[in-house]
């Protein structure tokens, strides 16, 4: 995925930040979908396709389904908690950073940064 396309998706996403994180779904082995409720009330998924040769990201409406299938997906589900407070890209690089605030609860989850490197092979 080209840096300009990533920039366009992030620009659209920034209009909705901070966005409430309503949970993760894993429709495929190489895909994570984070259900978000944006600042405007819009409900959408931040969909990350992270498996080469064509990693990408997109904003999609509706609710996607799927349980974690790999240890990596189980780690994502355990650590990506709290509102999405920032989405950024360095220059027009093919790397995107998503900062989540974490959450307080029975077991506190610290803030985390999810990095998507959409460079392919």
Regions found by a protein language model. Give the residues of each.
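Gly/Gly-Pro- and Ser/Thr-rich, intrinsically disordered tail segments characteristic of DNA damage-repair
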Residues: 1-121
């Amino acid at each position: 995925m080209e840096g300009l396309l990533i920039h366009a998706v992030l620009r659209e996403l920034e209009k909705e930040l901070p966005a409430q994180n309503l949970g993760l779904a894993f429709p495929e082995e190489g895909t994570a979908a984070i259900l978000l409720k944006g600042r405007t009330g819009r409900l959408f998924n931040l969909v990350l396709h992270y498996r080469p040769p064509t990693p990408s990201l997109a904003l999609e409406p509706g609710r996607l389904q799927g349980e974690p299938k790999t240890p990596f997906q189980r780690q994502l589900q355990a650590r990506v908690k709290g509102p999405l407070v920032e989405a950024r890209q360095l220059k027009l690089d093919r790397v995107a950073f998503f900062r989540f605030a974490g959450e307080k609860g029975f077991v506190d989850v610290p803030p985390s940064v999810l990095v998507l490197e959409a460079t392919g092979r």
